[in-house]
Amino acid sequence: MSGEQTEQISKDKAVAAEQARKEQIAEGKKAAESPEVERRKKNIAEIAKLNEKAREAKKQATEQEETTTSLLERFNLLKEWHLNQQVNNKVKNPAMESETEPALADELKPDMSNLFARPTVTDLQKMKWNAESNKMATADDMAFIEAEFQSLGVPKENLAKVMWTLTRYCVGASSSQYLDPKGEEEKLCGGVTRAALIACIKKRSTLRKVCRLYAPIVWNYMLVNNVPPEDWQSKGYTEETKFAAFDTFDFVMNPAAIQPLEGLIRSPTKAEIIANETHKRIALDRNANNERFANLGSEITGGKFGCRVGTKWRESKCDNG
């Protein structure tokens, strides 16, 4: 073997050894770096999973929010529909006969110039009628009384309350023409006495007629405040009928009287009506002993009161047969 060949072989071996050394170094580095790389890759994978879960959670939250919004909108629409159904006025039993008029034949139509004309039901429905009673004060009477009250110094803004309190006073004290009123309503009447107010009333009407006009109002007042007439027990009324123990009870349901805005709290019971009529009969009989005298001169009366009207209440018996 020549020297050149030997030299070439030595170079090749040196190159191979150098290559082997480099590969060994590379493998050593690779072996040293492998755990760190794996850890990084693992972390990257976990981060990717977390990001994916976050995106999924966000997507679900968005879908849930959209669903909630949709349900809320539907709920609001449903609530609005129900609110629209809540109306105060509902027509019931709609038999609206007054909407149409019968097509009467000409020969049946009433001749309004003839006093003997026969009205139809429609004609009667068209007639406007205001309830009136000659047993209570009229609007003309009340206009005069109101003017008198104001001229005495009763504040204008208190006129209605003054009349309410005055008629309520008469519930306990009486509405008789012989009533001797005491006291005054200082806060309402501006210092005007009850006696002066009642005197003004008597110029034009009677106290009882005025009290009848306000009977429904004092009735409601007593019921809503649970304050019956003060003398109910002394008049012989029972616990069940005590609210009927006043003079003008029989005008509580009179449509010509001034009505409370909401109407009567309740109507009088049969027991209350019977009790009031009974007491009225007793009171009239007690005061009727002198009614048969045509003249009250002593020559006629002999200086004595008349005989008491005899009413045999205790002999009234029920027929049990």
Curated annotation (Swiss-Prot):
Disulfide bonds: none
Keyword annotations of the record: Capsid protein, Helical capsid protein, Ribonucleoprotein, Virion
Record field: compositional bias (Basic and acidic residues): 9-39
Places the protein is found: Virion
InterPro entries: Carlavirus_coat_N, Pltvir_coat
A cellular component annotation (GO) from this entry: ribonucleoprotein complex
Keyword Ribonucleoprotein in annotation: yes
Domain of life of the source: Viruses
Region: Disordered, residue numbers: 1-43
PROSITE patterns linked: POTEX_CARLAVIRUS_COAT
Keyword Ribonucleoprotein recorded: yes
Any one GO molecular-function label of the UniProt entry: structural molecule activity
Function: Required for genome encapsidation. Forms ribonucleoprotein complexes along with TGB1 helicase and viral RNA.
Similarity annotation: Belongs to the potexviruses coat protein family.
Protein name in the entry: Capsid protein
